Amino acid sequence: MTVKAEAARSTLTYSRMRGMVAILIAFMKQRRMGLNDFIQKIASNTYACKHAEVQSILKMSHPQEPELMNANPSPPPSPSQQINLGPSSNPHAKPSDFHFLKVIGKGSFGKVLLARHKAEEVFYAVKVLQKKAILKKKEEKHIMSERNVLLKNVKHPFLVGLHFSFQTADKLYFVLDYINGGELFYHLQRERCFLEPRARFYAAEIASALGYLHSLNIVYRDLKPENILLDSQGHIVLTDFGLCKENIEHNGTTSTFCGTPEYLAPEVLHKQPYDRTVDWWCLGAVLYEMLYGLPPFYSRNTAEMYDNILNKPLQLKPNITNSARHLLEGLLQKDRTKRLGAKDDFMEIKSHIFFSLINWDDLINKKITPPFNPNVSGPSDLRHFDPEFTEEPVPSSIGRSPDSILVTASVKEAAEAFLGFSYAPPVDSFL
């Protein structure tokens, strides 16, 4: 009986281990999902929902965050509730202006495609979103916020630029800078971790981008390796501004529960008001991952990972310099009022000894040679994109002209909900 019981336990352990590995692989593939999708997936797992820790942290049995959980159903938006950002230029753009060549990314509401403008012969990354999917999850506010932030980003070298936007009856189109050096996530997967000088360079460019957003009273809220791109020379480009919060002044706070699980700051998990320092926590988490290969409090068990973020002391292995250790301890301070950046925001980060070798004027002017060159041969070089995306066929509907779309009641509702989305740069802009 003892031998049989032991054998049964061994079999169970092996099976469970295989399951955990499969879950981890799937989880890593789905890190690109927003927190909404991630939590909905957890909530649909009966086994996970039984854990008191999961119920406590996510409050699954008593949803109180309609913006996160979509717990309170509401009727379709009436005309008075429709989003209207005011007058904007009409670019007269349409899908048939482009050759859509390859899928280079995917998200909750659509795809990102490499496209060539037929008249200009210029390559762009075109983010195409399904209006009905956005409306179904009540995410119009975040999409419009992303558009607003993109309009402010055009003057900063480490933030992706919006060239113009337009819409059809059923889709939204963001025409963005095409960046083909790969996601930081992709390079971390291949190399596991970076040497400290390389991590310092990336952290400095990321901090510069975050500092610029903060100067515009914008909190980014979703810094992670998947949202950090490398351009063709190896410089950082921050992208995906859907979770940005606008109008947060120096001492201002917000309380929406959002972000990506591995990078959530303690105050966000506690559902307390939080401020700009949430971005400095995320910078610390990304820097830690660049140096060590995993986020600082990572666990395969989500509830355990959240408990680690809230309660576990930061553990730093000895293979980094004292200045890197000091910076990580300052950024990953659980008390946001004591966190590095709490007093003087970006200026505190900029003046830290870890960055003493960085000439910030040269950095912002891209006069510092990046430590890694993606060595892309041109716009059609897709070696740094996941084949999972690039091998997917381009949907024919993406390039379809508006006249060919059947305008149903739901399509009309979707079209009206995004009045003011279209944008064209002024004639005297850099474009």
Swiss-Prot record:
ATP binds at residues 104-112, 127. The keyword Acetylation does not apply. SUPFAM superfamilies: Protein kinase-like (PK-like). The modification Phosphoserine is found at residues 74, 78, 397, 401, 422. Residues 1-60 are annotated as: Necessary for localization to the mitochondria. CDD domains: STKc_SGK (cd05575). This is Serine/threonine-protein kinase Sgk1. Serine/threonine-protein kinase which is involved in the regulation of a wide variety of ion channels, membrane transporters, cellular enzymes, transcription factors, neuronal excitability, cell growth, proliferation, survival, migration and apoptosis. Plays an important role in cellular stress response. One of its GO terms (cellular component) is endoplasmic reticulum membrane. The active site is at residue 222. It is found in: Cytoplasm; Nucleus; Endoplasmic reticulum membrane; Cell membrane. Residues 356-431 form the AGC-kinase C-terminal domain. Residues 81-91 have a biased composition (Polar residues). Belongs to the protein kinase superfamily. AGC Ser/Thr protein kinase family. The gene is Sgk1. Two specific sites, one in the kinase domain (Thr-256) and the other in the C-terminal regulatory region (Ser-422), need to be phosphorylated for its full activation. Phosphorylation at Ser-397 and Ser-401 are also essential for its activity. Activated by WNK1, WNK2, WNK3 and WNK4; which promote phosphorylation by mTORC2. Regulated by phosphorylation. Activated by phosphorylation on Ser-422 by mTORC2, transforming it into a substrate for PDPK1 which phosphorylates it on Thr-256. Phosphorylation on Ser-397 and Ser-401 are also essential for its activity. Phosphorylation on Ser-78 by MAPK7 is required for growth factor-induced cell cycle progression. Ubiquitinated by NEDD4L; which promotes proteasomal degradation. Ubiquitinated by SYVN1 at the endoplasmic reticulum; which promotes rapid proteasomal degradation and maintains a high turnover rate in resting cells.
